[in-house]
Amino acid sequence: MDSDRKYLLERVDEAAVAQVYADGFDELPIDQKILIWHLYRAALAGRDIYYDQRHALSLEMREVLEEILTHADEIDPDVLAEIERYTKLFWINSGPYNNLTARKFVLRCTREQFVQAAVQAEKNGATFGFACHAGVEVCLDRMMPMLFDPHVDPVVTSKTPGAGRDILEASANNFYVGVSMADLETFTERYPLNSRVVKNGGGIVEEVYRVGGKYDREIREIV
């Protein structure tokens, strides 16, 4: 091992960001290098699928966070540092849940400070895209429980939801939308590892992950 190499790049709370070296890559034949490049591009194309599966608001939250950080002029430095800390954890964990514990982490600034930062970012030219067609303050209100309240959707998959609570309804993930365990008693999933189940207009629909189906755009880029 080369003692001059730097492996630990940064620590963010309990998370460590490590650098990995691809020893031997330069010696690979060109066809294997091309394969690795395509796999890398496929991973980038598909990463938003995992974000969306973890929570329905993950992609919109990430967009707002990144727009604030890239349009940060005149935002309070302490608030900006906290938003940066939270965003780094968001990137590391592919969403607002710790990959090891599956529990949600939250921002440590106030709601008012976060809104002020977003409004200032918008003045600086931030465009929040699909997340905020109605204006940043209106759309942020919808995200606030996810950003600040540890008791709202606290865990990705709730295995012990408590008396009277349904496992699916108590889980934060985006695999079952509006569906309870009772709903599934008379419903058979055809693609249980490759679909999302949604209660739609009183009926239950299985949205299959495939070209022409759920995540069409991402899967087309992957394949």
List where the protein language model places each region.
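N-terminal helix-rich structural modules
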Residues: 2-222
